[in-house]
Amino acid sequence: MARAASTLAAGVAQRARGVTTYAGRLESLYQANLLSRQDLQRSYGGAYLSFFTFFERSIEDLFLGLVMGRLTCSTATRSLVEIRSEVVARRLVAGGRNYADWLPFEQHTVKRAPAFLSGGRPFTDVPGNDRHALQRAHYIRNALAHESNHSLKQFQRHVIGQQFVPPHERRPAAYLRGAHAVGQSRMEFLLAELVFVFDRMCK
């Protein structure tokens, strides 16, 4: 029997809470002079990358679950193919590659969805603001993972942009640790944003 896709969304929310709790413990160690600022910022970067990997895998799980009829959404979704084997499904979705990319969302997930799901729903129904949030998350991921001139320029242009960010917070990991609002780091805000986006995707 198919289960509600909202169970996947609950898993993403739980992972985000775990990352936020982890960051709070790191801050306590830093305040107690048991962790250097450099190590603290590196830990923020690692925590974000870990969550991003889990998030992208959750998009894959949602996609395959809907295609194979294992998951249901309240949004009208209908698989265009009948596949019982997950191995076969993964091969078809990957299109001959060893694995399938899901982000950038527009480039991979939205482009792939109409071949497997009627109208590409729910992925083609993701609104513009949510797609922007997913793209921004990917820019941050690339800047942290690659630290190349190109990825850092993309980060500066598309993530920092015109907003005021103190000079010492203009690198990716330091940016994540910086304050989005009183009592909330940028990483905490960004994870909450992705949780919201994925929850809407699953409805």
Give short role names for the model-derived ranges.
Residues 31-34, 38, 113-195, 202-203:
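Charge-enriched, short contiguous segments at helix-coil
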Residues 1-53:
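Charged alpha-helical initiation segments
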Residues 1, 82-90, 162-174:
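Short, helix-capping/interhelical loops that line the mouth of catalytic, cofactor-
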Residues 40-140, 153:
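Helix-loop junctions and short alpha-helical segments
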